[in-house]
Amino acid sequence: MKKTINLPQNYLDAMKELLKEDYEDYLASFEEKRLYGLRINTLKISVEDFLKISPFELEPIPWIENGFYFHEEDKPAKHPYYFAGLYYIQEPSAMTPANVLPVEDGDVVFDMCAAPGGKSTELGAKLDRTGLLITNDISNSRAKALLKNVEVFGIPNLCVLSEDPKKIADRFTGFFDKVLIDAPCSGEGMFRKDNKLIKSWEKNGPEFYSKIQRDIVLSGADMLKPGGKMLYSTCTFSKLEDEETIRHLLRERPEMHLIPIPSYEGFCPGIIENEEDTAMQIEKCVRIFPHKMQGEGHFLALLEKDTDAPENYHAKRKPSTEKLPEELLKFLSHVTFPVQKQDIFIRDSKVYQVSPEMPQEGGLRIMRNGLLLGEMKKNRFEPSQALAMALQMSEYDKIINLPASDERVVKYLKGETLDFENENDYQDGWNLFCVDGYPLGWGKYSKGALKNKYLAGWRWQ
């Protein structure tokens, strides 16, 4: 088999020991084409409504209610709906962690290793504009990509960090209702998708990543409230990175215990090796293999913190008492999106709406705290791209709405000047530019011209 010849022999030996009679089926999966998936953003559109307008041929991912397989040649990243944040392109099995974590309205949620944002975008959609999502990546460059993706998705109640998980754990001990850790790993489940990862595995394999995982999983447990839930996942098959990381957690944090993950055909249980595993109920973990399901592969463990674990008090952020500029208030009079004055803060001319669930800032590298509403410039207010994406079309009263088939939509996304023959197509001031009823960004009409205000760094390339 051509593709498996290049796999390291020590990896093949480990998989043969792991899979036993399924080993040949696993090798055969390398002859199959890689799979492509997209996940619908239910914060902006229902699955039913998206399927009515979808320009792509889609097949349901059986265990993900808002996930679908697509054909590579359809190129959904080159469609205006992608720029409107109606879906996220994600490997099918990688959709599982955020799907499994039982996020509820009003929860305070932490995504520890979040870039580029596949899990965070789903967690934010599940919160449905309630609660608070704090999302983090230790790498500043990756955190920038994360910030863009959560803003494209229109998630308003967020804070984006670029910080060491241990430092965050010290700051937010016992703070979160839900924690997701899609841990850095050796990536064995991605070999079929990207065979360049094989060289990375040979350089830094399971032993390298296991040390990192053992540290961050303890930090995650420490950040949970009593009764809180944590989802640990990897895209690797190594027992050292998977079940053994969970064993380490359960030994070090006896207040944590495994709870069942809803079963689907093809999910495999965690691997039991001894009586301790049985006592810990390691079989409640889930493994996804490419020869069992239509996905590249994943490991998941859902855990809960005992309700009688010690509680921690966190001082709430004080409401804003700032006097808001008249130009800002004038703009907000056109918006029906729920903006509370006591949640608006102005920092270095930038205007933010900060979740009331967010405690006092300090001591952390914050990329974005709250929804960036816009910026004050010489006594005028300029709304942000992030605000445009967080709005529904019905929440603003000056609209330009074009069908996806209109060539001006792509021109807008490229930052080009737009031609409108009919003056009724727009109004003075800031217009919300939409495609088929879904916001893309801003345009400003003044002095007889409509200026394209689509964010330069997001433009269609």
Where are these regions (language model features)?
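A short acidic, Gly/Pro-enriched loop at the edge of an enzyme's catalytic core
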Residues: 104-105, 167-182
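Class I S-adenosyl-L-methionine
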Residues: 176, 229-232, 237-352
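Conserved class I S-adenosyl-L-methionine
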Residues: 106-115
